[in-house]
Regions:
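Non-transmembrane, aqueous-exposed alpha-helical and coiled segments at domain scale
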Residues: 1-172
């Protein structure tokens, strides 16, 4: 239940395209700076408070067909680390960093204890990252957040989006 019948792993790309895995030399894992979920099923970091509403509104997290708000929560680094390992991800792309710009505090899930998330809390940056294209121009707290993600999942964020347009992207 709660899954697709398609293979959503990097190995599924090889099968779907009809090419051998040795011809794939880079695997880019893509994750939002927070977590969302469409439909039913478990979502350990789901937020039911104003933070969840803010993520949905600022991130425009509404279904394209139904218009229903997507379920939003803090970034689950345990799940992301597992996905990166399972897919042999070589580079990480973090999207929607700008959605977190107005958050005073930002949490990430670093473990589970009795089916509950264990969080690490970060200070927000409370300034706009929208449109920034150079990593060094990011607010210091945003860089701390990204560095922690990279260290935890053991993958460099070589692409970071800071807005909805293609040109609002940091390439490292």
């Amino acid at each position: 239940p709660y899954v697709t019948s398609s293979s959503t792993t990097a190995g599924g790309v090889s099968t779907g395209l009809g090419i051998g895995p040795k011809y794939i030399d880079k695997i880019i894992g893509i994750s939002k700076a927070y977590t969302t979920r469409v439909g039913e099923g478990p979502f350990i970091t789901e937020l039911f408070d104003d933070n969840g509403k803010m993520l949905a509104e600022r991130g425009n997290e509404f279904g394209a067909t139904t218009g229903r708000p997507r379920r939003c929560g803090w970034l689950d680094l345990v799940a992301l680390k597992k996905a990166i390992f399972t897919n042999s991800v070589t580079d990480l792309c973090i999207t929607k960093l700008d959605v977190l710009d107005e958050m005073k505090k930002i949490n990430v899930c670093i473990d589970y204890e009795n089916d509950l998330p264990v969080y690490k809390e970060f200070e927000g940056w409370l300034s706009s990252t929208e449109g920034i294209t150079e990593y060094d121009s990011l607010p210091e707290n945003a860089k701390i957040y990204i560095k922690y993600i990279e260290d935890f999942v053991k993958s460099k964020a070589s692409i970071i989006s800071t807005g909805p347009s293609r040109d609002q992207t940091i390439l490292r």
